[in-house]
Amino acid sequence: MTLLNVSDLSHHYAHGGFSGKHQHQAVLNNVSLTLKSGETVALLGRSGCGKSTLSRLLVGLESPSQGNISWRGESLAKLNRAQRKAFRRDIQMVFQDSISAVNPRKTVREILREPMRHLLSLKKSEQLARASEMLHAVDLDDSVLDKRPPQLSGGQLQRVCLARALAVEPKLLILDEAVSNLDLVLQAGVIRLLKKLQQQFGTACLFITHDLRLVERFCQRVMVMDNGQIVETQAVGEKLTFSSDAGRVLQNAILPAFPVRRRATEKV
């Protein structure tokens, strides 16, 4: 089943010029893509290529300058109030900047309950039980429930944001560089959790990243973005190779997992 369909999406931002006239800076240009239930897809590209702008459009935080975004066959622009509430539950996003994504005055307990209060019909006791369950799923314990964001490490807060997104059992989870910053052990644990959710609920995942290793470990398909356009789409197999210049640049930039020892005869 197709969850998300994007057709000919373009977006620009207006900036004031010295002459007083607005100048338009194009960020996305004719982007089209689809995501299906249970699918794991990566959007790969260097910083500034338009990935994060696209993610904001996909979750409805901004409206595109041109083109259409459909969720389960319905255009986002035409959703009624009840449909929009269901959409906000079905599609959740975890941002790279976790500090800006939470209220620093709220406790972790309040942060986790927030989407459940607004999007689910659960009693308070059920919300608290699920909050604890989601914390354990991301390798945190109940001792953080009464803490506030400034009292947590960056990795802990990122996992709190992930737990908050998972609490409403979304159909699509968008992770904007949200896993790349975790250490390898935590990253592996999060990936195991996401795979479990896919098996149980058919949750689709869109990884917005520059981390090719993450793509190779977890994703089924990868789209390469460059200068606001998707320039290549590849299935992820044992040997992932790119045909686009942007894809090859990203692949060549990856360091080996372990340092390569020089032979004794090699000159330094």
UniProtKB/Swiss-Prot annotation:
Enzyme class, broadest EC rank: translocase
Residues forming coiled coils: none
Primary subcellular site in the record, as a coarse category: membrane
SUPFAM superfamilies referenced in this protein's UniProt entry, alphabetically: P-loop containing nucleoside triphosphate hydrolases
Keywords carried by this UniProt record: ATP-binding, Cell inner membrane, Cell membrane, Ion transport, Membrane, Nickel, Nickel transport, Nucleotide-binding, Translocase, Transport
Signal peptide start-end: none
CC per GO annotation: plasma membrane
SMART domains reported in the protein's UniProt record: AAA
E.C. designation(s): 7.2.2.11
Subcellular localization(s) per the UniProt record: Cell inner membrane
Pfam families attached to this UniProt entry: ABC_tran (PF00005)
Catalytic activity: Ni(2+)(out) + ATP + H2O = Ni(2+)(in) + ADP + phosphate + H(+)
Domain (ABC transporter): residue spans on this chain: 4-252
GO MF annotations in UniProt: ABC-type nickel transporter activity; ATP binding; ATP hydrolysis activity; nickel cation binding
InterPro entries reported in the protein's UniProt record: AAA+_ATPase, ABC_transp_ATP-bind, ABC_transporter-like_ATP-bd, ABC_transporter-like_CS, Nickel_NikE, P-loop_NTPase
Annotated PANTHER family: D,D-DIPEPTIDE TRANSPORT ATP-BINDING PROTEIN DDPF-RELATED (PTHR43776:SF7), TRANSPORT ATP-BINDING PROTEIN (PTHR43776)
Function: Part of the ABC transporter complex NikABCDE involved in nickel import. Responsible for energy coupling to the transport system.
Subunit organization: The complex is composed of two ATP-binding proteins (NikD and NikE), two transmembrane proteins (NikB and NikC) and a solute-binding protein (NikA).
Similarity comment: Belongs to the ABC transporter superfamily. Nickel importer (TC 3.A.1.5.3) family.
Protein name: Nickel import ATP-binding protein NikE
Taxonomic source organism: Escherichia coli O157:H7
Gene from which the chain derives: nikE
